[in-house]
């Protein structure tokens, strides 16, 4: 079997973490609804929030409300915020109206926001009450997407965590893939694993409530995203076993992720090589073509999407880049530890954010590429730095072999663009 690169002796797992707890620049967890509502076809996400929440979702999703997407906002008015109206009665009325108009809804999520958190609206109690009213046709769950409690991708983690306690119990040995991916990418993963003889394979979240996976002591699960720490913990409490592995970004990460699952199911080396040889070769070729402008360049990750550590591993080991600092909102070593193990010590590893201090470090380092949020990119570009929007890495298919070249291309394009602009300026 073609083995990945050797693991360095001194790794980033041993690097002391710089913990920062200052001002931060990041989206709230409501943004997870943008991809979750597309994945879960008979679910509806009802945000209990303000007009700002509604505008965020509508503009980010690029969907007009009259198109009847699978999300909406129950607006908290001034009377609700002032305690002059019974918010629970109004919520019950809105849910009744929604479900009568949309009989296709099988699962309803009540999603908390900053305003609902501030007035201490008990959405957990509301979900229990509404489940009793609308069962068995509709199951009502709740989670928080509030910016007070969550950052960007944590919304998906909170959503999936809310589902785990109501998953059916099973004693069957099954593989559960945890995390929402575009259908075409998920199909690639399932196809590779199925060709190795691994199965049954279930997915959380399932596209329809009737296909919801069971969980029990014989369930093994692998996370598809590095921001699902609470979901992994909840599944473990239900008796499931977590397969730890680097995340499937690039050829190396995908191979090691598949290998960890294959080992769990007793797949021999010949079968593994037969299934993965061709896509691995395609991935290596695509990465080599796309990363030509990345080799020898430096990269600075500001905390945003929770993808930072696995992506830094991909860029340093497969694209020849040097990481100066790898910032991540939260570091869950139970998930990203295998990626940290593959990176040699050297980069600063930071958790959380104090944005002014971090900007000072960016300016001092002058990296060839800075991966950051939308609000920071344009000011840094104006200062002459090359940036990549972190949000693109969440909304673009980047997992597994067939997307490896596209992933490298996302980073190389801004570097190439900067080089062309410098050349034109010199002329």
Curated annotation (Swiss-Prot):
Cofactor(s) named in the record: [4Fe-4S] cluster
InterPro entries: LIPOR_BchN/ChlN, Nase/OxRdtase_comp1, Protochl_reductN
Entry GO MF terms: 4 iron, 4 sulfur cluster binding; ATP binding; metal ion binding; oxidoreductase activity, acting on iron-sulfur proteins as donors; oxidoreductase activity, acting on the CH-CH group of donors, iron-sulfur protein as acceptor
EC number of the protein: 1.3.7.7
Pathway noted in the entry: Porphyrin-containing compound metabolism; bacteriochlorophyll biosynthesis (light-independent)
Subunit and interaction comment: Protochlorophyllide reductase is composed of three subunits; BchL, BchN and BchB. Forms a heterotetramer of two BchB and two BchN subunits.
Biological role: Component of the dark-operative protochlorophyllide reductase (DPOR) that uses Mg-ATP and reduced ferredoxin to reduce ring D of protochlorophyllide (Pchlide) to form chlorophyllide a (Chlide). This reaction is light-independent. The NB-protein (BchN-BchB) is the catalytic component of the complex.
The family this protein is said to belong to: Belongs to the BchN/ChlN family.
Protein's name in the database: Light-independent protochlorophyllide reductase subunit N
Organism: Jannaschia sp. (strain CCS1)
């Amino acid at each position: 079997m073609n083995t990945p690169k050797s693991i360095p002796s001194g790794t980033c797992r041993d690097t002391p973490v710089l913990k920062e707890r200052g001002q931060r620049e990041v989206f709230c967890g409501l943004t997870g609804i943008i991809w979750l509502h597309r994945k879960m076809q008979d679910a509806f996400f009802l945000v209990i929030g303000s007009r700002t929440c509604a505008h965020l979702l509508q503009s980010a999703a690029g969907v007009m409300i009259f198109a009847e997407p699978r999300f909406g906002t129950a607006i908290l008015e001034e009377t609700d915020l002032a305690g002059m109206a019974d918010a629970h009665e109004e919520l019950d009325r809105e849910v009744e109206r929604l479900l009568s108009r949309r009989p296709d809804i099988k699962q309803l999520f009540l999603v908390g926001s900053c305003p609902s958190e501030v007035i201490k609206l008990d959405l957990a109690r509301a979900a229990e009450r509404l489940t009793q009213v609308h069962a068995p046709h509709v199951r009502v769950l709740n989670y928080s997407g509030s910016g007070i409690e969550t950052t960007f991708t944590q919304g998906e983690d909170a959503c999936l965590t809310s589902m785990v306690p109501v998953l059916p119990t099973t004693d069957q040995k099954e593989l559960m893939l945890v995390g929402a991916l575009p259908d075409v990418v998920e199909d690639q993963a399932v196809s590779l694993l199925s060709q190795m003889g691994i199965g049954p394979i279930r997915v959380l979240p399932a596209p329809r409530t009737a296909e919801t996976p069971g969980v029990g002591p014989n369930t093994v699960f692998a996370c598809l995203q590095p921001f699902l720490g609470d979901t992994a913990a909840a599944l473990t409490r239900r008796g499931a076993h977590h397969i730890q592995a680097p995340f499937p970004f690039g050829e190396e990460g995908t191979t090691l992720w598949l290998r960890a699952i294959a080992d769990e199911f007793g797949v021999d080396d010949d079968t593994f090589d037969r299934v993965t040889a061709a896509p691995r070769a395609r991935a290596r070729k695509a990465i080599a073509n796309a990363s030509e402008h990345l080799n020898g360049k430096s990269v600075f990750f500001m905390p945003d999407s929770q993808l930072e550590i696995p992506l830094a591993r991909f860029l340093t080991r497969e694209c020849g880049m040097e990481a100066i600092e790898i910032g991540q909102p939260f570091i869950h070593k139970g998930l990203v530890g295998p990626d940290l193990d593959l990176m040699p010590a050297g980069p600063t590893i930071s958790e959380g954010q104090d944005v002014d201090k971090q900007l000072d470090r960016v300016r001092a380092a002058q990296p060839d590429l800075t991966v950051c949020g939308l609000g920071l990119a344009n000011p840094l570009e104006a200062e002459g730095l090359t940036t990549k929007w972190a949000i693109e890495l969440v909304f673009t298919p980047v997992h597994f072999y067939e997307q490896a070249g596209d992933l490298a291309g996302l980073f190389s394009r801004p570097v190439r663009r900067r080089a062309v602009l410098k050349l034109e300026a010199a002329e």
